[in-house]
Amino acid sequence: MSIATSLGFPRIGRRRELKSALEAHWAGELSEAGLQEAARLLRAESHSLQQGLGIGHIPSNDFALYDHVLDTACMVGAIPPGYGWRGGEVTLPTYFALARGTGGGDAAAGLPALEMTKWFDTNYHYLVPRLAAGQHFAVTANRPLALFREALARHRRTRPVLLGPVSFLLLAKTDDGSDPLDLLDRLLPCYAQVLAELAAEGCAWVQMDEPVLALDLAPKARAALRHAYETLARGATPRLLLASYFAPIADNLPTALALPVAGLHLDLVRGRDDLAPVLAAIGPATWLSLGLVDGRNVWRADLRAALATAREAARALGGSERLMIAPSCSLLHVPVDLAQEDRLDPAIRPWLAFATQKLAEVATIARGLDEGEGAIAEALEASDAALRTRRDSARVHRTDVAARLLGATPEMERRPAPHAARRARQRQRLPLPAFPTTTIGSLPQTSGVRRTRAALARGEIGAAEYDEAIATWTEDAIRLQERIGLDVLVHGEFERNDMVKYFGEQLDGFAFTRHGWVQSYGSRCVAPPIIWGDVARPRPMTVRWARHAQSLTARPVKGMLTGPVTMLQWSFVRDDLPRETVCRQIALALRDEVADLEAAGLAIIQVDEPAFREGLPLRTADREAYLRWAVSCFRLATAVVRDDTAIHTHMCYAEFQDIMPAIATMDADAISIETARSRMELLEAFAGHGPSAYPAEIGPGVWDIHSPRIPPEEEILALLRLARRKLADDQLWVNPDCGLKTRNWREVIPALENLVGAARRLRAEAIPA
């Protein structure tokens, strides 16, 4: 008999209970004990649900209060100096100091948070472990064991999930730039201890996540994997299920298959080609976990096709006794339960599956494999019907959108003049000071803003009253920015609920959920739109409020749009068309909006692409094609303006070195990037030398907005001085790392005042009186 299993379940709860508990704790309204009890209840509910769905191997230690990579760092004592940790179990205040920084308004006493970056090619963010060259590791507390015992007390024998030692090190950074893998022998005793204690407790299986197997690995990394698992195998351990996901294991398969582990998990949604070579080479006693249900998207599985794949594997293995049926990856990346969605279009709803439904699909496939098609005939018929109605829907496939795509030409992707010529015309139109100051876009969305939006949604206020409130907040924001002294203003985006949802709600082809939340980082949750059909813009989306804001001030106000690649990346995308095609549909819709903003008098239009690198395939061989169409889509959306209109863009935390040619080819007039946590390290990619230098203007973030800490003026000035060493003065803008929507005005006003003050001091240094 096969085993239905899961690699991980969403942490946040059906109603975002984790978010509520965390934010209450941070506000001083919930004790540490209360927070831990809320977490315990969430874990119990998750395990009960999975057991009820027929999941045989239920994961534990897939839950984290903030981030599972941070949990691993805390477990092995990888705490940087300065956070007050002196050994022993890491306290909750220290844990949150690492995650969020400390100090608040007391900047002098504050500590910065750990650097944050994207988890592979997803929109989940992890905290980057910071290691010393001679890092000492020690188990501070065996959290996997504690959570195994917690579940065991509820009569559930779970399979703990650990981030594997090699992936942990490759996801980390060292203070001196040395190779983290050099620390492997120091780290392995911690893993050996954790595994031995789990084995002694009667734990049968442990899931070891080594997602770096989906990357192009150097020989040293492959050798590290062999050394790590051979070392661990010499000790007392439960059976290990080695899990990789997000891309094919491909040329790392010989390494994975040679490791002394009891089982191997394959992502057969993104790595279907791995199956045949694994079936041909897998050991006679090794278990195989088949990731047949997409753990990263919301579409219902093709149960008949999945069952056929499971049968193929069973035939090759001589039966289903060594097979596990699973999602492709952790279900962290999808919403919890479709059953909560009572307002979805009834035509679209049958095409979808969230985490709960996906585990039901997993259990159904396992049952069909073991008992035959007849046992799941009703489920197979429902799956077939959903696929058929989606394929044949005239709402999904629109002839007008197809015709416009066919009519798009390469000329539509080219600006009239090169950047140098455009820069002169833009500066003539907007004579800004050296080191101009601005923000990235959004301003704090206070409880009053959220209450007003909710009141409109509930029908408690009308559109006129809502619009009056938005107009008031917008004018207040303009006046505040003028008083602070910012050079280029934003309207604040008070009318926007989310930088993707706001646009998707006004575009054809998008659907929205009420409870479709997924974790981005910590307590930050997003509800991605679902792109279910061809995309088109029925009417202008942002022009009204942009025009209104510009009418209130003589200073330039930026038009603010979310770019086509980010709209794609931060949505659940239809899987019946190539992603490139969907992105071009979005680009054409945004092109019309860009043209309308320019016609409304906006001199700067910012088209944000924070997810541009996030879409980069994990495998090098696949990247050129992605970058080609991603750049093409950005240019298709933006190359509609005159030379004296500036196109800005913004990108979030990422490693830019390997995509710099593509970023330059986007042909934006200015780019802002998140650099505060890395202390301008990311600027190295943009500085370059000669032809490799980024040709346009750059705004390196000087204030980490993901932390409540207020950076002092001296700190911002120091970062700007670092930036001046890498960039020409006429390239440098001064701005925060990201939008300010999630911060409050008590943090934002003094931080912006410090930012403007630092820019003025920098001007004085650069241009002495």
UniProtKB/Swiss-Prot annotation:
Catalyzed reactions: 5-methyltetrahydropteroyltri-L-glutamate + L-homocysteine = tetrahydropteroyltri-L-glutamate + L-methionine
Cofactor binding note of this UniProt entry: Binds 1 zinc ion per subunit.
Cofactor(s) needed for function: Zn(2+)
Pathway assigned in UniProt: Amino-acid biosynthesis; L-methionine biosynthesis via de novo pathway; L-methionine from L-homocysteine (MetE route): step 1/1
GO biological process, one term: methylation
Pfam families recorded: Meth_synt_1, Meth_synt_2
Active site positions, chain numbering: 706
Binding site for 5-methyltetrahydropteroyltri-L-glutamate: 16-19, 118, 524-525, 570, 614
GO MF assignments: 5-methyltetrahydropteroyltriglutamate-homocysteine S-methyltransferase activity; zinc ion binding
EC main group: transferase
Ranges annotated as spanning the membrane: none
Ligand binding (L-methionine): 440-442, 493, 608
Residues that, per the record, bind L-homocysteine: 440-442, 493, 608
Alphabetized UniProt keyword annotations: Amino-acid biosynthesis, Metal-binding, Methionine biosynthesis, Methyltransferase, Repeat, Transferase, Zinc
InterPro entries attached to this UniProt entry: Cbl-indep_Met_Synth_N, Cobalamin-indep_Met_synthase, Met_Synth_C/arc, UROD/MetE-like_sf
Gene3D superfamilies xrefs: 3.20.20.210
Positions contributing to Zn(2+) binding: 650, 652, 674, 738
Known EC number: 2.1.1.14
Annotated function: Catalyzes the transfer of a methyl group from 5-methyltetrahydrofolate to homocysteine resulting in methionine formation.
Family: Belongs to the vitamin-B12 independent methionine synthase family.
UniProt xrefs under NCBIfam families: met_syn_B12ind, PRK05222.1
Protein's name in the database: 5-methyltetrahydropteroyltriglutamate--homocysteine methyltransferase
